[in-house]
Amino acid sequence: MSDHAKYSPRRFHPQAEAALADPVLRQNFRGAMDYLRAKRRDAFADPAEEAAVRDAAEQIRQRCLSRLPDLLEQLEANCERNGIRVHWAQTPAEANAIILGIAQQHGVSSIVKGKSMVSEEVGFNHEMARHGIRCLESDMGEFIVQLDGDTPSHIIMPAIHKNKQEVSDTFASNLEGFTPTTDVDALIQTGRRALREEFRRAGMGLSGVNFAVAETGSLCLVENEGNGRMCTTVPKVHVAITGIEKVVECLSDVPPLYSALTRSATGQAITTYFNVISGPRRAGELDGPDEVHLVLLDNGRSQAYRDEELRKTLQCIRCGACMNHCPVYTRIGGHAYGTIYPGPIGKIISPHLLGLESTSDLVTASSLCGACGEVCPVRIPIPDLLQRLRREAKHDAQPGHEPLAGQGAARSRLETLAMQGFAFAATHPRLYHAATGVAGRLRGLMPKHLGPWTQCREAPKPAPQSLHALLRQKKKES
């Protein structure tokens, strides 16, 4: 289940309250987040080296995005030259239709999947199931949440919200012959045995893409479990799906980005596996698919690209570091957001995918502490972009800016009238002094609760005397 039907960004507040009231979930996230932050801290022990790595990664992503249309054309040409068939999808529906057509052409009844956030974005599993095609997640975390009828809560560790006992309970309920245990090695072996035969039976393997190299027409896949390599080599057909922003100019761009990604995500110098796919199996090769397809998805990315400020959201390399350091995400987890991409990065990506009408609550679910921007390996100014999206949610597009989907959806007529009234009073001194004087005299009648903000804070009251009155009094006394 990957369509997030259980959760919705429109229900962010009740979902967040439910998460905060769940002590097991809070404890699971506390331990996991502490671990990931410590691993990243150790990986970047030298501040000068950290700055150099982040500077290099930022420069590469900005350079590649500045040439995005040209690089996409170059990628398509070189992929086709290598025997990789390239497909373009504007929407999730188009992406699913393309892959469904490939599957039906080859009589595929089961698909084994590697880690792919874009497949979650398009609701791939749900759509294939509607047409009688079984999809099985092979990433261990994704496999666990799929067995449980759950959804991922983190972009690199999908089952991070579950502890060992919960994983054991999931296996006991879904896998025959499993003996309940909380031994991590035993749990991993159980998952491995369940998945092994699926690779051989599957008619298609689906994967994501970490870096698509325009210069060579190659697809790079970063992983730790080996399931990605199995998905891309054992089935006769391999389909890779990715967003259009994942393209890089040349192979030499990959190592700096790879280093920034692994250190920021899991604190590793390198991952266990790094796969470079440059076409289907050739004559004389012993393994590999007969066909390789690449699906390039837009789904709102072009609109972000056309805005020079919002284009920075496309720099993301999906490391998850911003989530691990966010005081909101680390307390409520990923499900509360109700979006495929949770946490700080999800707040600035989701409006392009879903529109501001359904995501306006997310952009305000931030203290703007800046922790996300401080750890982002490609230096995305997430706090600045959140403030921009807050404005977009409540106001019309500024001159020269293309309106976003759902522009102004969070506009409040009462709030607008209140601000207009304040602006009028503030520009008319006599009216302003009279209003503040009345407010000071009536301060005892102020209600204790003024909306959600005062549910956990004391409502501020007007001062007994205004600043002007205090200054006049002091002047008289002197």
What feature does the model see in each segment?
Residues 314-321:
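Conserved, hydrophobic alpha-helical core segments of structured domains
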Residues 284-313, 328-448:
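Ferredoxin-type iron-sulfur electron-transfer modules in oxidoreductases and energy-metabolism complexes
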